[in-house]
Amino acid sequence: MEEEEEIMQKRDFLKASALAAGGVLAAPAIHAQQPVRWRFQTYAGAALGEHVTKPIIDSINRAADGALRIELYYADQLVPTGELFRALQTGTIDAVHSDDDSMASPAEVRMFGGYFPMATRHALDVPVLFRQYGLADIWKTAYEKVGGVTWLSASGQDPCNFNTKKEITSLDDLDGLRLYTFPTAGRFLSRFGVVPVSIPYEDVEVAVQTGELDGMAWSGITEDYTVGWADVTGYFLTNNISGAWIGSFFVNEKRWADLPEHLKAVVLACIESGHFYRNQWYWGGEAKLRAEGTKLKLRSIPAGEWRQVEDAADEFWQEVSETGETANRIVSIFRQYRDVINAAGVPYSFV
């Protein structure tokens, strides 16, 4: 009898031990954290977004290993591009890739995002201006003042050329053209008779076909071919009003604050890697498509005549610099940098 009782006690002990062990093994599954989920919208349509935004999002999702999962939306899919800032600030979306101008940012730096006339000549000017000349600190501070949105990083992309249905060979040819363009760029181009038009990104190609638009002053030739605009316009003007688009990555302030430090590092590293990808994609694309592209005929306005646009940009800079302390500071940096690259000569400047 005593022997049977001892056997029963051993069985009970083993059973209890097994249950306890199972509980320990199951504990991580019970207490595992749910992945952080973000909804991210880019300024770019699907065809362009495949190159300018999606590689970064894919890299973040892989590197985060399930701890952060970002769902990417393209231009106007969740909210119109002009409402991106407010949607981000209120938490309707969690992160954004856009220029300050297009998303109607209330920050003091708004008009300098996108294409500020004649501020840059090459894509690499943008990281130099932000990292070596102080623009990063200005942008960061500007969004801290507004609140609700954290600025993460900026980069350069393609120049702002013209692709149109009719050829442009003089400034007079710009008069009356209805062009899809950025707010500040449109404000500047209106000095030459351009009628700036703002419509949803994905509607632009059809608007050219129906005659609502005469073309675009929105991008370089790489984007024209990538998104289909080269199929509906016949000419590409090699003169540009800016050498590189200034675009940034933004995140809702609270969502960023709540993100663990190691995931913040993942996000920032993947964004920086994406900057490199876009630099080579655009730089190579602009050259190859100008040299070998068959859809758009290249045209140019003579340098002497184009000088009028450069002079008008100087006047525009002065007007903008008088609008506030931050604007004056940024314009001063642009002037300082222009003096440096002009003195350096080719390939930094064109003279």
What annotation goes with each model-predicted range?
Residues E4, Q9-V126, L135-D137, T141-V351:
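N-terminal secretory/targeting leader peptides
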